[in-house]
Design a protein with these regions (language model features):
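A beta-strand edge to alpha-helix "cap/lid" segment located at domain peripheries
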Residues: 2-33, 38-121
Length: 121
């Protein structure tokens, strides 16, 4: 991986970790800084989310400081200029989910464009 690719992947990882931080999730404005205006998600529940609906979840305290999400096996790859694909496992309150995100570089920085969660066996 080139230095430029490594920096892009690290920027996406940093953004992903911020979105999992309960202190970031508590403030819609901070979450919005990290989500692309065209953001969509297919959750582990099978539900489809957009920016507005996901803000309801993040601001509702779905991740508590007492029980933070545990991330493992995080990896990323640049799939096109300005686009990074991340995958990792997230463990939260006894539930293990295989997660996948697409991040794209915008005029305001790296933003999550798409996210999907699949329950892990």
């Amino acid at each position: 991986m080139t230095d430029e690719s490594e920096l892009a992947v690290q920027a996406a990882i940093d953004g992903e970790m911020r979105l999992l931080d309960p202190e970031v999730r508590a403030f819609s404005a901070r979450v919005l800084e990290l989500l692309d205006p065209e953001f969509t998600e297919i959750g582990a529940s099978g539900r489809w989310w957009d920016v507005e609906s996901i803000l309801t979840v993040t601001s509702g305290g779905s991740v508590s400081p007492e029980s933070p999400v545990k991330v493992s096996e995080m990896s990323g790859v640049v799939v096109a200029p300005g686009v990074v694909h991340l995958t990792y496992f997230a463990d939260n309150q006894g539930r293990r989910v295989w997660r996948s995100s697409l991040w794209r570089l915008t005029e305001t920085g790296w933003r999550m464009y798409f996210h999907q969660g699949t329950l892990a066996s």
